[in-house]
Design a protein with these regions (language model features):
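Carbohydrate transferase catalytic cores enriched for Leloir-type hexosyltransferases
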Residues: 1-380
Length: 380
């Protein structure tokens, strides 16, 4: 079987959580199924070191999507042509958008429906496109894959899609995240924060991630505790949020904030050496970033909304993302209570054992097979 996938969102050297998880998921699926051919399609050169096996062909082609017209060319002309050229049996649309101009069986990945809840950073033309076309994409798909029950329920309720059409593939923290020993932690802290303890956020720097409220919470923490602790924001700056860098430059505690784009290797080490991971996002379709932190054996503070509680269970402290004082209170609670911190780490180990990237890849592969309607073929 030939499986084509749109991987435009993956492969950057800059770590941003979801796309890194998706890249690794596709990588494992291809490696575990050497008898099938994979065609990974991207609109830009792949920056990440390619670890794909010989059964993977990476196709780099334009146009890069910068506006609605180029998006239409990509999905309605370029993608159908490539699917015909490579005689694809299944097409994986990895970002919730697909071509409506092909008969190729479709596995549609819907990570979230954030455009319905947090539309302000989205250009009006793109927002109009998503609101108008998403129902068509969902109806067209042979199988829909999400990474949480939360998103599945949203799809069913808001777009009247049958539950039977939707498969929930649980997320998993990447195996590259692991607990550091004390010497490694001290080495990382010395390198990045002058030996000081720090809270960390990893992921794309984007309005949806609620980092302004995180800065406000850190201000409250600094005022109340009079501590020398730092805040690390590790991730690439979204092009829609360039003014955030200026906010950090004028921030009262700017000398205690480290904002940096980083590779996944750096994110692993920075996360493992942190005192706690803070993820106060307004909306999330999956908890992969939280699971990365849990795998690193550090405690988690995250939002009570969307999919976070579904994923982290009792292994996290939960906050109202709209209330920076609530975020600050949880930071101070961990700062003061070492036994609570240790308890969350131990609970995290139990949660981490429930998620496995190999198992996630197997479930995803079964979803791909469901999208392929040809009768009488053994695709195991």
């Amino acid at each position: 079987m030939k499986i084509a996938a749109d991987i435009r969102q993956t492969g950057s050297d800059h770590f941003d959580g979801y796309t890194s998880f998706l890249y690794r998921l596709l990588e494992i699926v291809a490696a575990k199924n050497p008898g099938h051919e994979f065609i990974f399609i991207s609109g830009r050169p792949m920056q990440t070191k390619l670890l794909f096996d010989n059964n993977v062909t990476v196709v780099i082609t334009g146009p890069q999507i910068r506006n609605i017209l180029l998006r239409k060319i990509w999905y309605d002309i370029k993608i159908p042509a490539l699917l015909r050229k490579y005689k694809a049996d299944v097409f994986i649309a990895a970002n919730g958008i697909c071509s409506l101009n092909t008969s190729c069986p479709l596995c549609l990945i819907v990570n979230d429906l954030s455009f319905l809840h947090f539309s302000s950073p989205i250009k009006k033309a793109s927002l109009f496109f998503l609101k108008r076309e998403t129902k068509k994409f969902l109806d067209t798909a042979n199988i829909i894959v999400t990474f949480s029950e939360f998103v599945k329920k949203e799809i069913v309720l808001k777009f009247a899609i049958s539950e039977e059409k939707i498969t929930v593939v649980p997320p998993a923290g990447k195996e590259s995240f692991y607990p550091l020993d004390e010497n490694e932690k001290e080495e990382i802290k010395k390198k990045y924060t002058g030996g000081k303890n720090y809270f960390i956020y990893t992921g794309v720097i984007h309005p949806q991630k609620n980092l302004i409220n995180l800065l406000k919470a850190f201000s409250v923490f600094k005022k109340r505790q009079k501590s020398d602790w730092k805040l690390v924001l590790a991730g690439s700056l979204d092009k829609s949020y360039k003014n955030f860098a200026n906010n950090v430059k004028s921030y009262k505690y700017r000398n205690d904030v480290l904002m940096m784009a980083c590779s996944e290797e750096e994110a692993v080490r920075l996360t493992g050496a942190a005192y706690a991971f803070i993820y106060p996002s307004f909306y999330e379709g999956n908890g992969a970033a939280v699971l990365d932190a849990i795998n690193s054996h550090i405690p988690v503070i995250t939002s009570f909304n969307s999919s976070m509680q579904e994923i982290a269970g009792d292994a996290a402290l939960y906050v109202d993302p709209a209330d920076h004082n609530d975020i600050a209170d949880k930071m101070m609670l961990l700062y003061k209570d070492e036994s609570l911190r240790n308890s969350l780490i131990e609970k995290g180990k139990i949660v981490a054992a429930q998620y496995n990237l190999e198992k996630t890849a197997d479930l995803f592969w079964q979803s791909i097979l469901k999208a392929y309607p040809a009768p009488g073929k053994n695709l195991k």
